[in-house]
Amino acid sequence: MAIKSIFIIIIISIITSISELYALDPSFLRLSTSLQRSSFPQDFRFGAASSAYQSEGAANVDGREPSIWDTFTKQYPEKISDGSNGDVADEFYYRFKEDVAHMKEIGLDSFRFSISWSRILPRGTVAGGVNQAGINFYNHLINELISNGIRPLVTLFHWDTPQALEDEYGGFLNPQIVKDFVEYVDICFKEFGDRVKEWITINEPNMFAVLGYNVGNIAPGRCSSYVQNCTVGNSATEPYLVAHYLILSHAATVQLYREKYQSFHGGTIGMTIQTYWMIPKYNTPACREAAKRALDFFFGWFADPITYGDYPKTMRELVGNRLPKFTKKQSKMVRGSFDFFGLNYYTSRYVEDVMFYANTNLSYTTDSRVNQTTEKNGVPVGEPTSADWLFICPEGFQDVLLYIKSKFQNPVILVTENGMPSENDKSLSVNIALNDEAKIKYHQLHLTALLEAVSQGADVRGYYIWSLMDDFEWEFGYKYRYGLVYVDFQDGLKRHLKSSALWYHHFLSNSSSYQMD
């Protein structure tokens, strides 16, 4: 009887929170049957995503030691838009049960999160000590998800290298990282693999290498002095070294999983790569070649090795001896090292050829000999959003999916991030801020584009909204809100479902969908 009473209370609380959203302004939800969950394959899964440093908080709690992001945000607060950090973030570490309840309320099939390496291995290695409290946290989270019918999709590395390894040998600039990474993931597979059936080795390795080691905007903040105001780094060599050791770490992880765990646990493993769709700025042969080159340098940089065992030919030609080489043994290990492609897509770019190229002040940015822009003749590439880098380009999403299908042997694809932000306008009341109608339109357009790609043969099997909750958005701090769930950073981190969460709830329950104007 007590269990039945608790169940009734839970149901009432869910209805109340959904009703609160209706009460705000029911006009935002115009229902139709134009796009529903039933439009997608039966086993297609829908979810939302997060990452450890961006959401967990509890930075110095229960044995966790600093990552490079803890150090970067303290050492270079001027590189964060609002000077903030992830010390507290959403306090997901303490409030995960509340957040899982919201996931269930929305109707998520799956939740993507990452594991904090330095919460499991505070010093980065087993020799430095295994933190049982960290293992316990992720066990509790995984169990809570599964008990609520939500499938975990776990990212092993989401940009948060243990600071101890950065101090000891330079982190991903050193081949030693491959051994230490495999040691770390082995613990994760052993501790969580009986319940986690899908793993992402590394999130957006291209963005980590470019932003962290070419322009220095994110941790660890390295670049050549002629690129940005960095005190250390080499933008002509370090991005390629870091990428190389990321790829080898990924491949060694997949090899370990396949040899030791996959047959027993029955799971799958892949890498997540972010890309723009590269559109020739003008209909000329030079622009068309430039767009292909831009894709090679951004997406193919990682997708080519894990599919074919080596970097794109264009990179070999243009980067020369600054691009590391795989040994025959490494190439064999790297080739085919995925069960699925993880794709993060947000927006598109126009691309044109750079006609004049100087052999001075070299960097990853100049090596591709292209110029990326967000406008052509004063017209933006898509509808603008509150973020000056993100324009709404759903047709580019379809093009990316079909490009992956045709160039990379039609792999299984999971769309592991797709989303758009609203600005964190502190002058707005919470009730007004909860109405994020533009975000609903964005997702409707992109889901329609995804369906079209599937109809043309792309093997897409999942879609994850970025993000579950408003969180710490790297170099932008708390400037933007991507979440389905509003986090009130001014009032005790209280959670409120946004209108986009209600739309997703209706979409996932197959009852209705948002009608676009």
From Swiss-Prot:
A beta-D-glucoside binds at Q54, H158, N203, E204, Y346, E417, W466, E473, W474, Y482. Disulfide bonds join C223-C230. The keyword Membrane does not apply. It holds the Pfam family Glyco_hydro_1. Its EC number is 3.2.1.21. Residues 1-23 form the signal peptide. InterPro entries: Glyco_hydro_1, Glyco_hydro_1_N_CS, Glycoside_hydrolase_SF. It is an enzyme of class 3 (hydrolase). Glycans are attached at N229, N361, N371, N510. One of its GO terms (molecular function) is beta-glucosidase activity. It catalyses: Hydrolysis of terminal, non-reducing beta-D-glucosyl residues with release of beta-D-glucose. GO terms for biological process: carbohydrate metabolic process. The active site is at E204, E417. Keywords: Disulfide bond, Glycoprotein, Glycosidase, Hydrolase, Signal. Belongs to the glycosyl hydrolase 1 family. PANTHER family: BETA-GLUCOSIDASE 17 (PTHR10353:SF44), GLYCOSYL HYDROLASE (PTHR10353). This is Beta-glucosidase 17. It comes from Arabidopsis thaliana (Mouse-ear cress).
